[in-house]
Amino acid sequence: TNYNVTINPLPTPVISGLNAVCANQAGVIYTTPNVGGHTYVWAITGGAITGGAGTNSITVTWGTAGAGTLQLTETITATTCAVTTAFYNVTKNPNPTPVISGPATVCASDAGDVYSTVNVVGNSYSWTVGGGTITAGAGTNSITVTWGSGASGTVQLTETVTATGCATATANYNVTINPLPTPVISGLNAVCANQAGVIYTT
């Protein structure tokens, strides 16, 4: 007689999500279709699962630049039939590392002060200045600033790798704006020809 064997179907997990991210990028979501009665076990290298472990949708924070992987084992609870996906490879692109150079102490109303970072071909530059005005170089790696009359100012730079969208914003580069002296000349404004000993002061 025939010995009947039931051949249960296998699940078909498919991972969806970004396969290129920025180093240390958080909040990246990976999913597979949710099927009732199935369980989901995720494995990760080069990052950490920060939400959704044990479900069909996880949230990941990736680590430093390099390669990362995800793998998913989906199991049909009723039959214990399971499939583990191939590795889902993720490239973690490096972030730029802008460093601002320029005078940290200036005089009120100074003009022509230059602030810069190393120029990297293919990167873009967005500057923000507090307490002064950018007069040249906006959108480049080197700007010229005219300072105002306040006691302090700040320079901040966001550098972006155009090809990947990976960006880094610097902390504020603090600038001390020293006040100008206020000389006032006192003395006669009308004198006699050849008059000697006339005193002027401030």
At which residue positions do the language-model features occur?
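Solvent-exposed loop segments of extracellular immunoglobulin-like
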Residues: V35-V41, V120-S126
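A short beta-strand segment in extracellular, disulfide-stabilized domains
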Residues: Q25-N34, D110-N119, Q195-T202
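Low-complexity "stalk/linker" and mucin-like segments enriched in Ser/Thr/Pro/Ala/Gly
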Residues: V41-T55, A108, V129-T140
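Short, exposed coil/turn segments at beta-strand boundaries within extracellular/luminal domains
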Residues: C22, T77-T85, C107, A163-T170, ...
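Solvent-exposed segments in extracellular or luminal domains encompassing
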Residues: N56-A67, N141-S152
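Interdomain boundary/hinge segments at the C-termini of tandem beta-sandwich modules
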Residues: Y3-P9, Y88-P94, Y173-P179
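Hydrophobic/tyrosine-rich beta-strand signature of extracellular beta-sandwich/beta-rich modules
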Residues: L72-E74, L157-E159
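Proline-enriched interdomain boundary motifs that mark the N-terminal boundary
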Residues: P9-L18, P94-P103, P179-G187
